[in-house]
Amino acid sequence: QSRSSAASDVYKRQLVFYSPLQTIFWYDKPSFYHGEPEVEWFENLQTVFDDTKVLDGTPGKNITMARRKGQEWFLAAMTNNDGSKENVSLSFLDKGKTYLAYIYTDGGKEVKTRTQVKCSYLLTDASKVMKFDLKPSGGAAVRFVPVSKDEAKKYKKYKGEVL
């Protein structure tokens, strides 16, 4: 059995497997924290949600689901030991709104943190399909936050690239 990647652990135990007792302890020991940016996921992840959608999934292969609290959405995609390519329609987002997507994926050795989680910040909306190349036993997590036009000027748009 493969060991789960750090990015996979960010949401595997936190979003897909529901529990109102969400803590950073499920991801790592607080004493091991050295400013890794993906910890913002835990700072913002809710414990109770207003809506849950299973977007895709096959038992033993993969799952993609989204949960909403207020105007924010949290998405998690996980795969098995084989890895997978996932195309996730963002049609669950409110139409006409622009969202800042806080994206957490397995980054590998090019990410110079102990956890090797790649953090990306891109603008998107309900018309887009996000593409992920999930590593074996890996996945992706995304937090979608509505942004104003002024705030949106600070970020690049998601253009369909594989994440």
Task: Tell me the role of every PLM-derived stretch.
Residues 1-7, 11:
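Single conserved hydrophobic/aromatic residue that forms the stacking wall/gate
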Residues 9, 22-23:
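Mobile "lid/hinge" segments at catalytic clefts and subdomain interfaces of large enzymes
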Residues 29-74, 78, 109-115:
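Glycan-recognition and catalytic regions of carbohydrate-active enzymes
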Residues 52-53, 64-65, 119-121, 129-132:
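Beta-strand-rich interaction surfaces with strong enrichment in secreted/lumenal proteins
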Residues 58-99, 140-141:
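Carbohydrate-binding surface patches
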